[in-house]
Curated annotation (Swiss-Prot):
ATP binds at G64, P65, E66, S67, S68, G69, K70, T71. The keyword Methyltransferase does not apply. This is Protein RecA. GO terms for molecular function: ATP binding; ATP hydrolysis activity; ATP-dependent DNA damage sensor activity; damaged DNA binding; single-stranded DNA binding. GO terms for cellular component: cytosol. InterPro entries: AAA+_ATPase (IPR003593), DNA_recomb/repair_RecA (IPR013765), DNA_recomb/repair_RecA_CS (IPR020584), P-loop_NTPase (IPR027417), RecA-like_C (IPR049261), RecA-like_N (IPR049428), RecA_ATP-bd (IPR020588), RecA_C_sf (IPR023400). Residues 336-348 have a biased composition (Acidic residues). Signal peptide: none annotated. Keywords: ATP-binding, Cytoplasm, DNA damage, DNA recombination, DNA repair, DNA-binding, Nucleotide-binding, SOS response. The lineage of its organism: Bacteria, Bacillati, Bacillota, Bacilli, Bacillales. Can catalyze the hydrolysis of ATP in the presence of single-stranded DNA, the ATP-dependent uptake of single-stranded DNA by duplex DNA, and the ATP-dependent hybridization of homologous single-stranded DNAs. It interacts with LexA causing its activation and leading to its autocatalytic cleavage. Residues 325-335 have a biased composition (Basic and acidic residues). HAMAP family: RecA.
Amino acid sequence: MNDRQAALDQALKQIEKQFGKGSIMKLGEHSDQNISTISSGSLALDIALGVGGYPRGRIIEVYGPESSGKTTVALHAIAEVQAQGGTAAFIDAEHALDPAYAKNLGVNIDELLLSQPDTGEQALEIAEALVRSGAVDMLVIDSVAALVPRAEIEGEMGDAHVGLQARLMSQALRKLSGAINKSKTIAIFINQIREKVGVMFGNPEITPGGRALKFYSTVRLEVRRAEQLKQGTDVMGNKTKIKVVKNKVAPPFRIAEVDIMYGEGISREGELVDMAAEVDVINKSGSWYSYKEERIGQGRENAKQYLKEHTDIRDEISKRVREEYEIDGASKEPLEETEETLSLLDDE
């Protein structure tokens, strides 16, 4: 047994000498076993994710039908990162980002890094450079479907380019995944959906870009509109369901229900009223909502308005709800400039 241990120790020393300290270790010796997270900007989604937000150093895929709220979900996460003093980048392959809407959601557009690349290769090379800098806390690519390979752009309409985009994504993710983990960057890939032709049974919906992103993603979120939110005859927004389809850091298949209001994004007050009522932090009797024996509104909309006007009570309720769900809040520390992250570019 001693000979085996001595041989193992010798092998470990050789590996560390060749590849550097920390290249191999026992899992229990790892200094950071707890998953570091950044809040998604939505209390309901933080709870559904199970760890209080998006895990750092991981790949997240957000997909769904058109106008379901995918970009809104990503912009809320960017606003949260910036509020904690972090740096965020947005690669707008669709060339459709609305700065005014982003500002309404709390994004500091003066500090947001924005790129509108011409080709898929250019977009992913920019993404790699940003990740390897070790100085970007969150990177959003909108969207995978719009990452058009250079050969397709330079070709003519009607030319067949079978599997080009899938190969591009597969190669890019092979290069990016290690750097994303080392730099602790959260990489959010927004994706669209397509339908397979001739599927008789089962779900015909697929996401573009091949299978690679499905495998590399730690979390996959499916965003879908459930119903319209109306005030009288006017449509004010949509009730949206965000389903955690895949989760490597907590149990999957949880669903977050949020109100996405036009021009405002996710209604924090709406989800707070629902989540607080679920765990009896807010009491619901008939149509009345009350907190600590004090009525805060008749009907959900009035309760939402009360919390919007009384931010101190809103924050107090939010804290209690997080405690009830054992979500202690995401990490408040921005990415530190460690020797490891700053030397990422030199590792190639």
